C-alpha cells in the first residue's frame, strides 16, 4: 500500500509525514469531530507522544485508540486534545 506524504508545521518547524491514506482519512475525520484543523490535531498528538516514539507512529497509535473496532469514533483522546 502506498504512503501519502504531507508537509506541515509542527512546533514551528516544517515537517514531512508519511502515512497510509486510511490514517490520513481518519485523522481528518477526528479533526472534524473535534471541530479543529488537522494541523492543530497533529500538533497536539505530537506534543504528547512518548519519548523515542516517532510522530508517524504516534499518529497511527492515536487513531487506533480513538476508533472502536466497528469504525465508530470514541471519546478517547480528550485528555490529549484538551491539554
Predicted regions and their residues:
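Amphipathic, hydrophobic secondary-structure cores in small proteins
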Residues: 5, 9-63
Amino acid at each position: 500500500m502506498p504512503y501519502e506524504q504531507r508537509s506541515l508545521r509542527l512546533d514551528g518547524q516544517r515537517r514531512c509525514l508519511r502515512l497510509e491514506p486510511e490514517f490520513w482519512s481518519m485523522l481528518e475525520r477526528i479533526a472534524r469531530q473535534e471541530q479543529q484543523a488537522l494541523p492543530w490535531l497533529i500538533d497536539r498528538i505530537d506534543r504528547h507522544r512518548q519519548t523515542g516514539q516517532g510522530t508517524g507512529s504516534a499518529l497511527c497509535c492515536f487513531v487506533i485508540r480513538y476508533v472502536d473496532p466497528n469504525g465508530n469514533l470514541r471519546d478517547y483522546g480528550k485528555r490529549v486534545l484538551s491539554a
